[in-house]
From Swiss-Prot:
Cellular location(s): Membrane
Predominant location category: membrane
Membrane-crossing segments per the record: 28-48, 63-83, 223-243, 256-276
Keywords: Membrane, Transmembrane, Transmembrane helix
This protein's record includes keyword Membrane: yes
Pfam families tied to this protein: Bestrophin
Source species taxonomy: Eukaryota, Metazoa, Ecdysozoa, Nematoda, Chromadorea
Similarity comment text for this entry: Belongs to the anion channel-forming bestrophin (TC 1.A.46) family. Calcium-sensitive chloride channel subfamily.
Native organism: Caenorhabditis elegans
Top-level lineage group: Eukaryota
Name listed for the protein in its UniProt record: Bestrophin homolog 14
GO cellular component, one term: membrane
Example GO molecular function: chloride channel activity
Membrane topology type: Multi-pass membrane protein
Gene that this sequence comes from: best-14
């Protein structure tokens, strides 16, 4: 079940379900047990020479642990898993748009049975398809007889479904029943070609979500990458069993502070193992972990919504004519926290009166004349400046010749 939370930060850290504490507790306890076994071996069973030799192993493991690119591996792995997790959620099919189109194209009490049948088959489609990817839905509908008992499938539909030979799966059969029912309404003249096309587009869109979930269930994250990340993480902390031990030889105890509890290693385990557990839990979001998707709830919700749209909401229309007010009132609570009205970054930009004056054709001619006069004046000034520079250059050259003589 997806865990919701909106408490303050201090209360959030004390949550258990779906928390980091629950995710890493067993691994943390196992690490502490192994850590203190190694510490007891070093403390009680090694003499001074053995402790000096063991200190060399500690230093060697400390250096070796730095060569494992754990942050890079976990960062890329979890980013891939989270993106895939959200994409799978977006593949969950919702019948709302399809049932809205069904209600629009098949109105009236005379089409009530057709609308309700399409609604029921949409829920049957979800129950069959999700039973193939979700453990929770499979436990709810372990066999097709359970769908008959749940009134999602009739005995006739059960016989048709079971007698269909489909070696590559038959989860799509209810969708075909919906398509055939729409075709029948077209043949009867109840809907036209345009309405049929709009209905079929919604049915195809509804079907695509189930197909993509089967694709995600089929194509997993490559096993070799999952193994690399798991081996790197657990291998890192296996090295830390020795590399983070206190140095108990006489020389080291005189120079360094000896701390018997692995404080910083504990923080690393919370971060790195918590990171790894996120990827492991989200890799299959249709299992039974705390943060897995509740497809049983989605099925209940979709069934109720589809039934409402097919029956009591299909032709419901309140009376019209009530005037619309230009402003929606606030409560005292919402009035205190009104949002700042967004403004364009050019809202305060203003031009002067001269800049806002419109340019007329005669103004353009006058402007071009003035520009031409300005160019002529500039050329004259430039020519005068060049001649002055040449004259000064000749004068300087003459002075230099006189000095040489």
């Amino acid at each position: 079940m997806t865990i919701s939370y909106d408490e303050e930060f201090s209360s959030l850290m004390l949550r258990w379900r779906g928390s980091i504490w629950k995710a890493v507790l067993k691994d943390l306890i196992g690490f502490y047990i192994a850590y203190y076994i190694v510490l007891a071996f070093q403390w009680y069973l090694l003499d001074e020479k053995g402790k000096e030799y063991f200190t060399g192993w500690i230093m060697w493991c400390e250096i070796g642990a730095q060569y494992i690119p754990l942050s890079f591996l976990l960062g890329f792995f979890v980013s891939l898993i989270v993106a895939r997790w959200w994409e799978q959620f977006n593949c969950i099919s919702w019948p709302d748009k399809m049932m809205i189109m069904v209600s629009a194209c098949l109105p009236g009490n005379e089409n009530m049975v057709v609308r309700q049948t399409i609604a029921r088959w949409s829920s049957l489609q979800a129950a069959i398809a999700w039973s193939g990817v979700s453990v929770k839905t499979l436990k709810r509908f372990p066999t097709e007889r359970h769908m008959v008992a749940s009134k999602l499938m009739t005995e006739e539909e059960y016989d048709l479904y079971m007698n269909t030979d489909a070696p590559h799966g038959k989860w799509f059969i209810p969708i075909l029943w919906i398509v055939n029912l729409i075709k029948k309404q077209k043949q009867k003249g109840i809907i036209d070609s345009i309405q049929m096309d709009m209905l079929l587009k919604q049915v195809y869109s509804y079907r695509d979500g189930f197909a993509m979930l089967f694709v995600y269930d089929w194509i997993k994250i490559p096993l070799v990458y999952t193994q690399v990340v798991a081996i790197a993480t657990y291998g890192y902390f296996f090295i830390c069993l020795i590399g983070r031990q206190p140095k108990l030889d006489q020389r080291s105890m005189e120079k360094e502070i000896t701390i018997l509890f692995p404080i910083f290693t504990t923080f690393q385990m919370l971060f790195y193992l918590g990171w790894l557990k996120v990827g492991q839990y989200l890799m299959n979001p249709f299992g039974e972990d705390d943060d897995d998707f509740e497809l049983n709830y989605v099925l209940d919700r979709n069934t109720a919504i589809a039934h409402m749209m097919a029956s009591e909401l299909s032709d419901q229309l309140p009376s019209i004519g009530a005037p619309m007010v230009p402003a929606v009132p606030h409560t005292r609570a919402s009035f205190k926290i009104q949002d700042v009205i967004p403004k364009s970054h050019l809202a305060g930009f203003k031009l002067s009166e001269a800049e806002m004056k419109l340019i007329k054709p005669e103004d353009l001619e006058e402007h071009e004349r003035l520009m031409e006069e300005t160019k002529v004046t500039n050329r004259q000034r430039l020519g005068t400046l060049v001649r002055a520079l040449e004259k000064k250059s000749r004068t300087n050259a003459t002075i230099n010749e006189d000095d040489e003589e």
